[in-house]
Amino acid sequence: MITTSPQHVSVLLEESIEALATDPQGTYIDATFGRGGHTRALLNQLGDDARVIALDQDPEAIAAAAAFADDPRFQIIHTPFSNLQQVLDDLQLNRQVTGILFDLGVSSPQLDDAERGFSFMRDGPLDMRMNTTSGETAAEWLNRAEKDDISWVLKEYGEERFARRIASAIVMDREKKPFTRTKQLAEMIARVSPVKEKHKHPATRTFQAIRIHINRELEQIEQALEASLSGLKEDGRLVVISFHSLEDRLVKRFIRKHSEGKQLPPGLPVTEAERNKDKALEKVGKAIKPGKAEVQLNPRSRSSVLRIARRVRND
């Protein structure tokens, strides 16, 4: 397994690169560069005429990409992956891409850096933005949002069963002292949560929900997946690693939707070609989860799921 820094171990690395790298001279997009683990492994598998375009909205990821500056096959673009269609248009890569990789979620360096505000285990500013140069912070949103809006976010994006109770406590507590720190929020959630789950901090779901909301994560995933259909050439691979059920359900639905032919009433005299006219993808194998050895090495990989699809037509 390739490690790009002492802090970061790429998840499902061998499995994802094996699925992705079908042409050693192809053009590939790593839509979630992070600290470059998957990009490095991919470049190691490719020939001199290959091309890898990496995207990331995190300024720290862009800085980490300097390690690849001497490789002429590599290009980094500072943009969220939801802008994938714009990147494809700008680089004239529609229907030209051999494989697109998405490694969703938060990287270990982001979680471990208290100043980013993603972790309830480390006290830091309540920020949670993937791109720290723009947008509303988690603290700003929590200190202004209506109780019902907070409750909806916690329930919808965190599947938090105590969403209303936590939202009410947030609104009540912020009147005395606005939320500014991760520890402040985590301790409040622990205080008001009536049930403590074994091996799970009470703030886990709330922090996930707020992060997804602040970064519009699910909306960005949907936009990027749709754009991938424009970019992939025939037989090109879509490879997606997700880390929680909301992401995985979204990816699974997307692949299933585009793997089905036209839905017609039974008994109609139509050819197989006509029935498959709207089919854009074909699922490749079953979902892949990390083995015991990987989970022991990197416990954060436990919830990860890898899904693979192949582009089946090019029009």
UniProtKB/Swiss-Prot annotation:
Reactions performed catalytically: cytidine(1402) in 16S rRNA + S-adenosyl-L-methionine = N(4)-methylcytidine(1402) in 16S rRNA + S-adenosyl-L-homocysteine + H(+)
Transmembrane segment boundaries: none
InterPro entries (alphabetical): RsmH, SAM-dep_MeTrfase_MraW_recog, SAM-dependent_MTases_sf
Main location as per UniProt: cytoplasm
Example of a GO biological process term: rRNA base methylation
GO cellular component: cytoplasm
Enzyme Commission (EC) number: 2.1.1.199
Subcellular location: Cytoplasm
One GO MF term attached to the UniProt entry: rRNA (cytosine-N4-)-methyltransferase activity
Binding site for S-adenosyl-L-methionine: G36, G37, H38, D56, F81, D103, Q110
Function description: Specifically methylates the N4 position of cytidine in position 1402 (C1402) of 16S rRNA.
Family indicated by similarity: Belongs to the methyltransferase superfamily. RsmH family.
Record protein name field: Ribosomal RNA small subunit methyltransferase H
Protein's organism: Idiomarina loihiensis (strain ATCC BAA-735 / DSM 15497 / L2-TR)
